[in-house]
């Protein structure tokens, strides 16, 4: 029971940091005026009226490029701490990182063979 007193500051911080955004959204929702009109329903593109249908569907190629980018971005996030502590971790960490990079390279080769990286 006495060990729970060590976490009082943590719980207070968690409650306050959760309450502030909730209160901000609630207060802005209550106090903001709601005006519906044709300007609110029209799409806005750099101050120019759009020509044609404003709701265009993106091609799947954009999503595939974004997905491949995210995978290799996450790889960088995981490999940076490993590279900074390489001399401390030893050979087993090197083998694990090598297997990790090998799996990602196999995924890249698979995406390349399936044509996910081609822009045509």
UniProtKB/Swiss-Prot annotation:
Instruction: Give UniProt keywords alphabetically.
Output: Chloroplast, Membrane, NAD, NADP, Plastid, Plastoquinone, Quinone, Thylakoid, Translocase, Transmembrane, Transmembrane helix, Transport
Transmembrane feature ranges? 9-29, 64-84, 88-108
Q: Which domain of life is it from?
A: Eukaryota
Q: Which positions are tagged coiled coil?
A: none
Q: Which Pfam families match?
A: Oxidored_q4
Task: Cite the EC number.
Answer: 7.1.1.-
GO cellular component terms listed in the entry, alphabetical order: chloroplast thylakoid membrane; NADH dehydrogenase complex
The answer to whether UniProt assigns keyword NAD to this entry is: yes
Its membrane topology is listed as:
Multi-pass membrane protein
InterPro entries from the UniProt entry: NAD(P)H_OxRDtase_bac/plastid (IPR023043), NADH_UbQ/plastoQ_OxRdtase_su3 (IPR000440), NDAH_ubi_oxred_su3_sf (IPR038430)
Query: Can you state which reaction this protein catalyses?
Result: a plastoquinone + NADH + (n+1) H(+)(in) = a plastoquinol + NAD(+) + n H(+)(out); a plastoquinone + NADPH + (n+1) H(+)(in) = a plastoquinol + NADP(+) + n H(+)(out)
Q: Which GO terms describe its molecular function?
A: NADH dehydrogenase (ubiquinone) activity; quinone binding
Q: How does it assemble?
A: NDH is composed of at least 16 different subunits, 5 of which are encoded in the nucleus.
> Which PANTHER family does the record cross-reference, listed alphabetically?
NADH-UBIQUINONE OXIDOREDUCTASE CHAIN 3
- Name the record gives this protein: NAD(P)H-quinone oxidoreductase subunit 3, chloroplastic
What is the native source organism of this protein?
A: Barbarea verna
- Specify the taxonomic lineage: Eukaryota, Viridiplantae, Streptophyta, Embryophyta, Tracheophyta
Gene name for this UniProt entry: ndhC
């Amino acid at each position: 029971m006495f060990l729970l007193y060590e976490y009082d500051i943590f719980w207070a911080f968690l409650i306050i940091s959760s309450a502030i955004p909730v209160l901000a959204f609630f207060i802005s929702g209550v106090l903001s005026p709601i005006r519906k009109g044709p300007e609110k329903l029209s799409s806005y593109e750099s101050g120019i009226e759009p020509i044609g249908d404003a709701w265009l569907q993106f091609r799947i190629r954009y999503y595939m490029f974004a997905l491949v980018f995210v995978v290799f971005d996450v790889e960088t996030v995981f490999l940076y701490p490993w590279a900074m502590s390489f001399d401390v971790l030893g050979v087993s960490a090197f083998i694990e990182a090598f297997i990790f990079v090998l799996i990602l390279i196999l995924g890249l080769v698979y995406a390349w063979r399936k044509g996910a990286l081609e822009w045509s």
